[in-house]
Amino acid sequence: MHAIINGRIVLNDKVLDGCALMFDEKIKGIVSRETLDAAWENEKCWQGKPLALTDACGAYVSPGFINMHIHGCAGADTMDAKADTLEIMSRFLVQTGVTSFLPTTMTCEMQEIHKALEHIREAATVITRRRGGKPEALLDEQVTAPEAETQKYVPARGVQEDSFTMQSGLPDDKLARGKNILPGAKVLGAYLEGPFINNAYKGAQKEEQIKTADFAFIKDFADVIKVVVLAPETLEQAGKVKDFIARCKAHNIIVSLGHSAADYGTALQAIEAGASHVTHLCNAMTGLHHRQPGLLGAALDTGVTCELIADNLHIHPAVQRMIYRTKGADGLALITDSMRACGLAEGVSELGGQTVYVKNGAARLADGTIAGSVVTLNRAMANFRENTGATVPEVVRMVTENQAQELGLFEKIGSLSPGSAADITLFDENFTILYTFVDGREVYKNPEFR
């Protein structure tokens, strides 16, 4: 059993002081410091289990962050689809407070996309179970690794090498993948950004590989794809839009509108058909005009969840404030959309076979087109709070609960409620990450913290 003491525990709408967070592999609850102190003085145990303590020293204690739109970091990119690609990303992300993520593909040859999806499938904690041919999304029941002998608590520095392995002898209908086969942040599934986009708003994606949306292209990976980006105007008839969205929803795939020239009416029809998400709001879409609201207007005028890249390059701070006041914290999901150069020194990098130049915190193609970001999620949180005045609980909600709710996983991740996975992040007032725990394991400690 583990307890975090002297921390400021971040809940949905408030911050708790003077309490301790109790957990093992799952969150056990929040207790008063007096209750914990009494147990420590008497037995140094909690509910009969040896108790280990982590002193937060006044830091914030929150659910682990969820980055639901990320192409790469630390030199790795989802489309590399190499044996160590997701491991590299997993190790780096916990240093930024991220405990779960959706590796994101981009427009390429379909066989390249499928190869990347296969790698994501192998690493994913979340899969799909089928009953009678009807898919049902779920977070697999956790397979508990053999319990280690109790040892004196010694915080690790950096990401721990040990990881849980897949267990055998599981029921065929569950296809359970065990707990987390990666050393750090968990893979929840895939985010498919392209090829179903509009070439007029392709951004840094390959025009020659763009395709008209067809569920047949992705049906064999419906178990692992959690989000698919759609430019609804590229489907000529409204019936095709509705059919594509309906098939995605039947497989628990979120349809996100983006990379799109859709007008307000077309976007609204797609939202009414079930599209519930918008990819990097303001970027790669029609802008807001008082006579032509476009996709941006439809996103602001409805209840869809809107992604935001708060690196202060993709969206001006003043516009971030406007969006925050319009959508509120519950309608926003902070993301990074980062590429492989995130976490590396500035210089020349690569995205989808294209040369990218990283300078002054911006990643661009030779023609000046923005090519993703190099921001980390904790830095985006700091920027957004500074730009908007959002509270710490609100900013945390935009990287935890909102994503978990939309992915249908809020009973499992994204909160500090009893029974949730013990994915926990500790950070200071500047959003510098101090500790990260995944499924109760300490996977990162800032070497400069005490």
Q: PLM ranges: what are they?
A:
Residues 219-344:
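Active-site core of metal-dependent hydrolases
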Residues 71, 87-119, 185-198, 222-233, ...:
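Divalent metal-dependent hydrolysis catalytic cores, especially in the metallo-beta-lactamase
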Residues 298-306, 324-420, 424-426:
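His/Asp/Glu-enriched, well-ordered alpha-helical/loop segment
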Residues 91-102, 199-224, 269-281, 292-305, ...:
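Active-site gating loops and adjacent loop-to-helix segments of metal-dependent hydrolytic enzymes
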Residues 1-42, 437:
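N-terminal metal-binding scaffold of metallo-dependent hydrolase/deaminase domains
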Residues 59-61, 68, 78-131, 141, ...:
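Alpha-helical scaffold segments that flank or form the walls of functional sites
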Residues 7, 405, 415-450:
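C-terminal cap of metal-dependent C-N hydrolases
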